[in-house]
């Protein structure tokens, strides 16, 4: 297996700052905004984006709000029988999502199936005004008509390659790597 680093800590930091600015511009501030990470690394990513948004808004207008939460999609996945996954994680919302713009956050967008499950889970929790998607890496190979609104890095890859996102909070370091020849 050959592993190569495609994003390092500084690259990830710049991408998250850009995504944060794009979310703020799209939403015209933090009013009515909820950022929900999909466990595990999507939650870390959502927290970082929310912290960045809070810093930007605090500097710009002195605004601050609790806007981040986690959305577990385990029981909404369509591949549970074929692919047993981790134990369900708690879902935590920053408040009611009705009428808000919800930004779903995940580390890698691949087939689109995780996001489809997230949309199903979200519909059981309320009726947002709009739903957007932010991902650190979009690697292509979609099986469903889903696209990200905010992307850190478009990283076309072969289906045989595996992309790993690592965050200091979970893995001890920040990096995005591609492992060639994995299935």
Swiss-Prot record:
Top-level taxonomic group:
Bacteria
Which SUPFAM superfamilies does this chain map to? PRTase-like (SSF53271)
Residues forming the motif PRPP-binding are: 102-114
Keyword check for Disulfide bond, yes or no.
no
GO molecular function list: uracil phosphoribosyltransferase activity
Top enzyme category: transferase
Return the InterPro entries for the record.
PRibTrfase_dom, PRTase-like, PyrR, PyrR_bifunctional
- List UniProt keywords, sorted A-Z: Glycosyltransferase, Transcription, Transcription regulation, Transferase
Q: Does the keyword Cytoplasm apply?
A: no
Q: From the record, give the cysteines joined by S-S bonds.
A: none
Family, per entry: Belongs to the purine/pyrimidine phosphoribosyltransferase family. PyrR subfamily.
Q: What is this protein called?
A: Bifunctional protein PyrR
Write down the species: Leifsonia xyli subsp. xyli (strain CTCB07)
**What gene does this protein come from?**
pyrR
